[in-house]
């Protein structure tokens, strides 16, 4: 009897906690479409639509993050007036993709970016191993490479609000994803921001997969390296031969 009474008390306490917890914080509801992206031979970037609702007094920010990765790069410099490799650099604990999407007309107090959501937070968490210990300069160059590829950056005017209805307002965001998007799982983080602080958060996931020719090339490169290298050499030889043939034919026509 005592055990049964105790079990019932625990169950009722759990129900009460859930009911009370539903009203303790601001609401944020988000949906992502599509939830998967196929990279085929014709892929040249994609668009993902995020819809949802946030507290009417808050602003929205959306962040798309890839998993943390490690990069090994060659450090170049001048030696006797010539550009040469001067060592290697390893940069780790940085995401493969970092895109921050902001609302139309952003700049009010509602949508001020909290420091922990911006690119500076990625910089602070990054680890750099190099012979030249100029960490800031190395990260600056690394971020420039990522931004040039469209894999890091901030996109303005990406989120549009609907008029508030009661305590909530709806939003729609169109997220442009780069042509250089790697395959894998990416988190779509939706934040409600008020007075420069995160008051609510929702997370969704999109899956990116290579199909067709890109998938075949990746499989060949990673699982059959020798064959891939041989084919690459043959393709280069054929391309050179074809270019030379066309060039000679063009000269002969004149």
Report each predicted region and the residues it spans.
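Bacterial N-terminal signal peptides
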Residues: 8-18
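N-terminal edge beta-strand
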Residues: 25-43
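Short edge beta-strand/loop segments characteristic of extracellular beta-sandwich folds
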Residues: 49-55, 174-176
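Membrane-embedded segments
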Residues: 53, 63, 67-89
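Membrane-proximal low-complexity regions enriched in glycine and acidic/polar residues
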Residues: 78-178, 182
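Short, aromatic-rich amphipathic segments at membrane interfaces
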Residues: 176, 199-230
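Extended, hydrophilic extramembrane loops/domains of integral membrane proteins
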Residues: 180-210
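Juxtamembrane interface at the cytosolic side of transmembrane helices
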Residues: 236-254
